[in-house]
Amino acid sequence: MSPFLSLPLLLLSVLSASYSETVTSEDAQKTCPTVIACSSPGINGFPGKDGRDGTKGEKGEPGQGLRGLQGPPGKLGPPGNPGPSGSPGAKGQKGDPGASPDGDSSLAASERKALQTEMARIKKWVTFSLGKQVGKKLFLSNGETMTFDKVKALCAQFQASVATPMNQAENTVIQNLVKEEAFLGITDEETEGQFVDLTGRRLTYTNWNQGEPNNADSREDCVVLLRSGGWNDVPCSSSHLAICEFPV
């Protein structure tokens, strides 16, 4: 081909390319911003780290689901401290007397107690040898000799008193019961020469042996019953047979 023929073709190609670039550049300005370069989307990156927990929200309303079954009861907790005492309540009304089909219970209890006391006294009497009874008195002796104070204590232990004859019959019973001298419940310790019983009463019956009482050596303030049945004053510190009288 002739160089002169190819030159026009070359110019035509340059013009066509220049026109095409001009048109493309104008279209690009219509679709892409002038600052940001247009390109195809990139590949998604990895997820970022979790952010910090936000503030706790308010309690929501119960859901509309079915309520679950009640759980089993828990273990008993430790007992609490005792509470303060309450104020006294109002006084109640007086109740009706209770029924007592067997009689008055208080009377029955009193009789039972009296019977028990009497049985106890009888048991104590058994500790003595068999005694003698006259009228409403029972005279008993344990056969032991001791001072007057010990005789008083012994008789008092058995709810009795030292034997004190108030008449000839009682004096004879005591005489037949003992075979040796026995203390009687008679003294003049308070007032010399004025013999009284242990309750302080003056004697209405006496059976002094001849020449008695003589208060020998000024120390004979107690009285014994002799084997003959007569009375004699002796020192209270001397030892003689113990004999007690019990009311029956």
Curated annotation (Swiss-Prot):
Molecular function terms, GO-annotated: D-mannose binding
Modified residues annotated as 4-hydroxyproline in this record: P47, P73, P79, P82, P88
Residues making up the signal peptide according to the UniProt record: 1-20
Secreted in keyword set: yes
SMART domains xrefs: CLECT
Modification comment: Hydroxylation on proline residues within the sequence motif, GXPG, is most likely to be 4-hydroxy as this fits the requirement for 4-hydroxylation in vertebrates.
Location relative to the cell: Secreted
Region of interest: Disordered: 36-112
Keyword rRNA-binding on entry: no
Principal subcellular localization: secreted
Keywords, alphabetical: Calcium, Coiled coil, Collagen, Complement activation lectin pathway, Complement pathway, Disulfide bond, Hydroxylation, Immunity, Innate immunity, Lectin, Mannose-binding, Repeat, Secreted, Signal
UniProt domain Collagen-like: residue ranges: 42-99
Ranges of compositional bias, category Basic and acidic residues: 49-61
Disulphide connectivity of cysteines: C155-C244, C222-C236
Pfam families named among the record's database cross-references: Collagen, Lectin_C
All residue ranges annotated as the C-type lectin domain in the record: 134-245
GO cellular component: collagen trimer; extracellular space; multivesicular body
Coiled coil: 112-130
BP GO annotations: complement activation, classical pathway; complement activation, lectin pathway
InterPro entries found in the cross-reference section: C-type_lectin-like, C-type_lectin-like/link_sf, C-type_lectin_CS, Ca-dependent_lectin, Collagen, Collectin_CTLD, CTDL_fold
Subunit organization: Oligomeric complex of 3 or more homotrimers. Interacts with MASP1 and MASP2. Interacts with MEP1A and MEP1B and may inhibit their catalytic activity.
Summary of the function given for this chain in its UniProt record: Calcium-dependent lectin involved in innate immune defense. Binds mannose, fucose and N-acetylglucosamine on different microorganisms and activates the lectin complement pathway. Binds to late apoptotic cells, as well as to apoptotic blebs and to necrotic cells, but not to early apoptotic cells, facilitating their uptake by macrophages.
Domain notes: The coiled-coil domain mediates trimerization.
Record-given protein name: Mannose-binding protein C
